[in-house]
Design a protein with these regions (language model features):
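Compact soluble domain cores
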Residues: 21-33
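Generic structural signal for secondary-structure transition and capping sites
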Residues: 23, 35-39, 83
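A short, surface-exposed loop/turn module that caps and links secondary-structure elements
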Residues: 31-55
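Enriched for short, Lys/Arg-rich terminal
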Residues: 2-5, 10-17, 24, 55-61, ...
Length: 91
């Protein structure tokens, strides 16, 4: 089953600021996650149904929530990992 991709407004604003190279890298990974959104090693502890995608070489992160009842992967936040700001924005 393929999930639908949605962005919360804040995440969409950040997404639009990304350069095309970073977007393409995230798109490739998001395409895989729409087929299989629950990757145990990428689950964020302390959050229910929230997972991350890491672009380690450039230090960017994307956090998303899986909503099974709606068959949706909702992007919650996108940004640089610096000082864990991206994770703090989830709280």
């Amino acid at each position: 089953m393929t999930y639908n991709l949605q962005f919360n407004p804040k995440a969409l604003k950040e997404w639009k600021k990304l350069n095309s190279t970073i977007k393409e890298q995230f798109k490739k990974k998001l395409k895989e996650r729409l087929e299989n959104p629950r990757v145990p090693k990428d689950k964020l502890s302390g959050f229910e149904n929230v997972y991350k995608i890491k672009l380690r070489t450039i230090g960017y992160r994307l956090a998303y929530q899986v909503k099974d009842e709606e068959i949706v992967v909702l992007v919650l936040t996108v940004g640089k990992r610096e000082n864990d700001i991206i994770y703090k924005s989830l709280k």
